[in-house]
Amino acid sequence: METQLQSIFEDVVKTEVIEEAFAGMFMDSPEDEKTKLTSCLGAFRQFWSTLPQESHEQCVQWIVRFIHGQHSPKRIAFLYDCLAMAVETSLLPPRMVCQALISSDSLEWERTQLWALTFKLIRKIIGGVDYKGVRDLLKAVLDKIQTIPNFVSSAVVQQLLAAREVVEYILDRNACLLPAYFAVTEIRKLCPEGALSHWLLGSLISDFVDSFRPTARINSICGRCSLLPVVNNSGAICNSWKLDPTTLRFPLRGMLPYDKDLFDPQTGLLRYVLEQPYSRDMVCNMLGLNKQHKQRCPVLEDQLVDLVVYAMERSETEEQFDDGGTSQLLWQHLSSQLIFFVLFQFASFPHMVLSLHQKLAGRGLIKGRDHLMWVLLQFISGSIQKNALGDFLPVMKLFDLLYPEKECIPVPDINKPQSTHAFAMTCIWIHLNRKAQNDNSKLQIPIPHSLKLHHEFLQQSLRNKSLPMTDYKIALLCNAYSTNSECFTLPMGVLVETIYGNGSMRITLPGTNCMASGSVTPLPMNLLDSLTVHAKMSLIHSIATRVIKLAHAKSSLALAPALVETYSRLLVYMEIESLGIKGFISQLLPNVFKSHAWGILHTLLEMFSYRMHHIQPHYRVQLLSHLHSLAAVPQTNQNQLHLCVESTALRLITALGSSEVQPQFTRFLNDPKTVLSAESEELNRALILTLARATHVTDFFTGSDSIQGTWCKDILQTIMNFTPHNWASHTLSCFPAPLQAFFKQNNVPQESRFNLKKNVEEEYRKWKSMTNENDIITHFSMQGSPPLFLCLLWKMLLETDHINQIGFRVLERIGARALVAHVRTFADFLVYEFSTSAGGQQLNKCIEILNDMVWKYNIVTLDRLILCLAMRSHEGNEAQVCYFIIQLLLLKPNDFRNRVSDFVKENAPEHWLQSDWHTKHMTYHKKYPEKLYFEGLAEQVNPPIQLQSQYLPIYFGNVCLRFLPVFDIVIHRFLELLPVSKSLETLLDHLGGLYKFHDRPVTYLYNTLHYYERHLRDRTNLKRKLVHAIMSSLKDNRTPGWCLSETYLKCGMNAREDNVWIPDDTYYCKLIGRLVDTMAGKSPGPFPNCDWRFNEFPNPAAHALHVTCVELMALAVPGKDVGNALLNVVLKSQPLVPRENITAWMNAIGLVITALPEPYWIVLHDRIVSVISSAVLSSGSDWLGYPFQLLDFTACHQSYSEMHCSYVLALAHAVWHHSSIGQLSLIPKFLSEVLKPIVKTEFQLLYVYHLVGPFLQRFQQERTRCMLEIGVAFYEMLQAVDQHSNHLAYMDPICDFLYHIKYMFTGDSVKDQVERIICSLRPAMRLRLRFITHISKMEPAAVPVSNSSSVQQTSSASSPTAQSTAGAAIPLSVTQ
């Protein structure tokens, strides 16, 4: 091949000797040149046609090498002409030629003439290269230019500029050689933000990059760096807040020149989240940290250190370290965060201590030093035994800095809890010294002089064998010697003995035959708070081990109340999670169950029901799954345990947070059976109600009409297989539409009341006619016989006023589990009986019998009977009768009302502050004993039966507390049926006080007002009554101002129907301001301080958000008006809203409005419509200035030049940034049905792109279907604008944005829909978008191999400057 090529080309360039001698005087005529060219090409064409395809590239490379081997510029120019002609006549492919030229090693800037000629040739033929080839050539040309040094002779610059001309041509928007989007990507890879382009290219590159700033802005959320989340404990993944774990930057898509603040590390956001209690899961979520993979995260480490420094600064300004003050809460939280992140190796302890030393040096901050050492002691004492001593020695550097005293520090007052902090440094020294001794290390440090008195005090206390519980000496010793087993045994032994009780003392527990160890006073919280994590772990480990040991031993003596209460208190500490709640669920419960220690099992379930706070959702669902498997075991088929298992399961189900339901249940999609009950219809119904509420509140089903393909489908299908049932139409009408459709399709035939009546009569006849006692017992208790026995007992009492002994025996034989089915049938039977009773005397008789069955004979407990009644699916009149029975059961006799009023009067819900709970508990049970084994019936039969039921220990529960989750359900059922509103008000009047003991009263109100918004719209009185009943039950146990605003309490609570209170703008501003101040961490904050570990909400912002939403939903004002008033807080000029803080207010409005039902937030769509229809955007006349500048809210706001449309844009972004994906999924419909018909001008189109562009990334991650619909809508709007506009001024930014969508999001998924649209656009637009469709025939002729394509319409988008830095380099690898 090479020989043939050589002969072809050497022939052409061969010259005579005389020509060479007189080189400057000989000149070929143009005809000779042409002849030479033609003959050379002819010979080459013949050769090329015989050459196999695979040798083509090699051949072209040889030719380039041959040309570059020539020294005569004339020869080179001639050969280049040959190449150009070969390309023009389609003999050689231009891409191959260009690539061979640019990649030649001989192409060096020093050979200036070769350089100039080569780039002129490339410039001439590059028009024929396909767009991906042009991209590769651009990259190669830019790389070649980088080889030119910064200093060259000015004489050669002219020749070097040929390369610049090639780049200029490639970047020419009108030539359209490739999507400009490709070009900017290559440029930004080479010159990231802040890097200067090569001098040869000058402003060419920077101007081109600047032309992409509008595209970057279209994809940016206004004020994104100021938006903050509310941290919850749901475990839901939230894509809006993800950050890069190495740089803390937002994960921005595409190599666009975003504004500088978007490229900055988002330390403010991470710091804010870290400051919130219970935020560690969210931090892991944001940074993508996985507990399984130990990976150090330096940026997280820095923020933790900064937080400690901030806490030190706070301590300087606080007068005293008061109990429960903000400073104490902050230090408490810090130690919890530090332990978690260091334990899982996301942060390195020695690095953090050294960094702290560096940041505190020279600051003179020493007021908080004890608290800092307390935080460090937590980690040191727990991990020093497993790690090298060297890891902990940097603490001594910190000591030298913070404890400059030359004299001894005096011993603090050890009657105060903060004394444990004052001793922290001494404890650290003791642990370090102990480690050094054990390791025989030479690093032993003598006790610093300033700590001598502290050390002596501890040594002396150790020698004192009787330690009192009245001061903090025990805590001090535990903290100092937890790594020294000889010394630790004494103080820990005292704590343990206090709660275990000494072996001899016994006390009785509620019920018969139930005895427990005698210790009743738990360890107080401030003592537990004063123990280091290591000491707490030893204590909880000791308790758990003892419980397991007692379970194995099948001890008949129940656990001491003090032990149970102390164990519950220890489970609140997140820092001991592995031994705490994790051990409780995955080790203790299974062990106890395996040992068949039913008393201890009952105790653990009671603890979970009445004493646990902020348990992560996956643990709760794991327990629920345990309970369902427990329910199937024969041994749990006893009245008390069965009742406890069902009650606990009911609490777990109804307490699931709306944002917790989907993430938790999707974990069980492969086996939904494990989280569902195989036999309890009530529990499965409760789960469906929870599911309906959760999907409504999170707007999961918004915009869809079927559950097909969702995580709910298998769950619902399995429930219907286990416990087929129907729903009453008034309940069903509140379900989200897809759930309604499912139950209408899966309708279950109901047994008619006539049949039920007939069957009861039939069975009753048998009862009366059978004589053999054994036959009767066998027949009525047999498995599979109709569950009608309670109906028969009812008839016996109605006809004979008594039940005989056989009745009792049958009940015993039926067993707790099977009896539930009898209660269910009985509930239906009662409704039919009451419906047909003649009223008056007979009705009173019916009520009396029913009450006797509950309170006199103890046949069924009130909470179970009411739950069954509330969960039946009666319609119309029968539903009213059912609710009437519930009301009578609860209010008619005094039995239950007295129990409630006494319990509410005598007890307080703050169990963690009490030392005498057990005494009050016993007093109550003595007055109102629980009878769970038909005791009343046993006494009444003739002859009476002597029962010796063995009760399981009851430490916390009673009928009132068990009734609370049932009451939640009852209220909801009553709300659904309009005619029973008055009855509900009566119930709330008499029993509302119970909400004092509800563990989530505000959340319950929030869920209720949200879920029933449609039902309560016009029932403002009932709404107010509900809020009033629940809030006033809590007034004695909450600080004033903890929930509802003063204005609302004054005007909203006492409003009359004829004089409805309509709040003014000031009211809404103050309400939003309260949330803004809370999130800003203002001190003192708008809400009273509290211990968040025992609060309903995990942190102040979550509390503020929920109480704000409850108050707004409780107003007697339509949702639409409230929504508009909230938007007006920033859209109208409000004196209470500070200009400089406007994005924080928008953030708060976004949080509040998205947490409200649809009518409240959908008004934003109306505002957007009015802006898009406004003259400014629709007139089409040129604006003063440049639209991209006007839509840059932050810059305009700072320069006081913002307009209404930019305010609405920024607010819409804040709202949508906080929206759930369900709420966002209405955007495609909004675009296609509402905005598309209005958008006619370029400004309107750009406004819509700005509005929706930033959310495509979220749609891609969470609802791809919506992203594709939006992509198509964008093209349809462009088509309308193209048809309505004579001139398009911003074609380039529009096309850049559409390319961004293609390469970052949609790929070719919408190609078929948009091809048709692109074909219909004006030629200039078609030319620019031709690479999206790949339709060559629509190109306005192949781009000529000459100067520039002649496109008449130019794009005049010069761009304002703004700064930015390279985003995540996402390769353009979407299928093209």
From Swiss-Prot:
Signal peptide region: none
Region (Disordered): 1346-1376
One Pfam family named in its UniProt record: Med23
Keyword annotations: Activator, Nucleus, Transcription, Transcription regulation
Places the protein is found: Nucleus
Any one Gene Ontology BP term: circulatory system development
Domain of life, per lineage: Eukaryota
Listed InterPro entries: Mediator_Med23
Ranges annotated as biased composition (Low complexity): 1346-1369
GO CC terms: mediator complex; transcription regulator complex
Family statement drawn from the similarity comment of this UniProt entry: Belongs to the Mediator complex subunit 23 family.
Assembly: Component of the Mediator complex.
Protein function: Component of the Mediator complex, a coactivator involved in the regulated transcription of nearly all RNA polymerase II-dependent genes. Mediator functions as a bridge to convey information from gene-specific regulatory proteins to the basal RNA polymerase II transcription machinery. Mediator is recruited to promoters by direct interactions with regulatory proteins and serves as a scaffold for the assembly of a functional preinitiation complex with RNA polymerase II and the general transcription factors.
Full protein name: Mediator of RNA polymerase II transcription subunit 23
Biological source species: Danio rerio
Highest classification ranks of the organism: Eukaryota, Metazoa, Chordata, Craniata, Vertebrata
